[in-house]
């Protein structure tokens, strides 16, 4: 049975969906004012694998991942660039789609944008005003009054009184409490705005996600996810406003992905230590990046380094070598039940991908010993749930080399062929050994000599 670590209760719990066989999942997406960095990729890959696994277990998953396309950062960046907000967001949405496609991240079933749900957001704010959980401030903003929700803090488990007394939140004189947050921002000159019962303005960030999640999945759904940095205040505020409006639990399970770090610090645009997905893709195969991102449990911090990416590359080479000579899978090919069960046990333990990867390596060892097509097909199928081992093995094993390097290898193969023809076995063996020392393995066959990279 699947068990998930629920941030709400701080423990692993058996997963029971609201509707048998069906799962509603909402994940906070990106704010499109810049290119996605590898920290975004970690979250997107983690939830992609969760969706793939749940579907492999027979669940009908409705996966929603939003796009924040109106925000202070977007407005500021568009102004800096001298472009319209629509131009800016379109550019970075296209870039995000290119990144996710390259990383083999499945598209969500629904990808709502905040600007497409203004009426839904306004209706939700009206409900909160009618119930007494929100107020119109002196400056025209509509704010949520945190003191009206006694359970505030139940997700992040923070000392709320300490936050207020320590002034660790922004003090705004128009708010009744420092913890109150804006639901609707009064329009400012030159900024985008929409008509509302409270005048022209635009939605606050927190209310956008609540409104879009409820629009796509209903007032209650199964799983809400995002990066650990969103737990407070974003997800805490989502719970407060959603449950105040409906009187029901918002999401049953809250999953949070640990931070990607560089030298022990969170990778973030605000710090300036981030690597864009596009830049990393220039240097590394997409499946290598996926493997690296899954090499640590999704809740744990993960350190970015070239060494860790190299280790991921070597690991994938070993897996690809195990399946390189396997005949194509046929309709009647059966998967090995024992290895499926071992893999499922790992994934049922809160999507434990490091253990799942160790199962794949044990299976690869068996494939190498037995050369069994059934085991090899099982290996490819299980790895496919993690989103890799899906390329042509020869293509992958020759990837990552410049064309000039490939030409040198082909030239050396030709020289070796000539040496063999001249019965100069010492030279032929030396060329093979030299290439092997550089991680290039030669294989002689009836149709000639082929080569592939191997794990050094």
Swiss-Prot record:
Q: What is its EC number?
A: 6.1.1.16
GO molecular function, a single term:
cysteine-tRNA ligase activity
Grouped into one coarse class, the protein's main location is cytoplasm
Kindly give the Pfam families that the UniProt entry links to this protein: CysS_C, DALR_2, tRNA-synt_1e
Q: Name one GO cellular component term.
A: cytosol
The reply on keyword Zinc is: yes
Which residues are involved in binding ATP?
269
Q: Where is this motif: 'KMSKS' region?
A: 266-270
Protein name in the entry: Cysteine--tRNA ligase
Gene field: cysS
């Amino acid at each position: 049975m699947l068990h998930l670590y629920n941030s709400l209760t701080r423990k692993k719990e058996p997963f029971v969906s609201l509707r048998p066989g069906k799962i509603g999942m909402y994940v906070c997406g990106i704010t499109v004012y810049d290119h996605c960095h590898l920290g975004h990729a970690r979250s997107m890959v983690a939830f992609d694998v969760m969706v793939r696994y749940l579907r492999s277990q027979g669940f009908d998953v409705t996966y929603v991942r939003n796009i924040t396309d109106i925000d202070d950062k977007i407005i500021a960046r568009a102004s800096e660039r001298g472009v319209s907000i629509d131009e800016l967001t379109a550019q970075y949405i296209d870039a995000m789609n290119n990144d996710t496609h390259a990383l083999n991240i499945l598209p969500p079933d629904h990808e709502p944008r905040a600007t497409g749900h203004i009426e839904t957001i306004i209706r939700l704010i009206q409900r909160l005003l009618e119930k007494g959980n929100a107020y119109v401030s002196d400056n025209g903003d509509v704010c949520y009054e945190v003191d009206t929700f006694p359970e505030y803090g139940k997700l992040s488990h923070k000392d709320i009184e300490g936050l207020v007394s320590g002034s660790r939140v922004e003090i705004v004189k128009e708010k009744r409490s420092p913890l109150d947050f804006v639901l609707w921002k009064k329009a400012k000159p030159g900024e985008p705005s929409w008509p509302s019962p409270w005048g022209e303005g635009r939605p606050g960030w927190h209310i956008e996600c609540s409104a879009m999640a409820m629009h796509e999945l209903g007032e209650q759904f199964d799983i809400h996810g995002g990066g650990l940095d969103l737990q407070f205040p974003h997800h805490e505020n989502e719970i407060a406003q959603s449950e105040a409006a409906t009187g029901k639990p918002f999401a049953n399970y809250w999953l949070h992905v640990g931070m990607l770090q560089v030298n022990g610090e969170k990778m973030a645009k605000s710090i300036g230590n981030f690597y864009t997905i596009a830049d990393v893709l220039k240097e590394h195969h997409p499946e290598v990046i996926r493997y690296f991102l899954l090499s640590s449990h999704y809740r744990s911090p993960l350190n970015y380094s070239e060494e860790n990416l190299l280790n991921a590359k070597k690991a994938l080479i070993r897996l690809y070598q195990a399946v390189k000579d396997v005949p194509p899978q046929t309709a009647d090919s059966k998967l090995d039940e024992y290895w499926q069960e071992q893999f499922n046990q790992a994934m049922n333990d809160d999507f434990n991908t490091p253990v799942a990867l160790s199962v794949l390596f044990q299976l690869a060892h068996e494939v190498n010993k037995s050369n069994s097509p059934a085991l090899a097909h099982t290996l490819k199928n299980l790895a496919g749930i993690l989103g890799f081992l899906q390329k042509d093995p020869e293509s992958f094993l020759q990837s990552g080399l410049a064309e000039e390097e490939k030409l040198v290898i082909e030239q050396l193969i030709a020289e070796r062929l000539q040496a063999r023809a001249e019965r100069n076995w010492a030279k032929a063996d030396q060329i093979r050994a030299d290439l092997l020392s550089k991680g290039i393995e030669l294989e002689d066959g009836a149709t000639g000599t082929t080569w592939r990279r191997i794990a050094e």
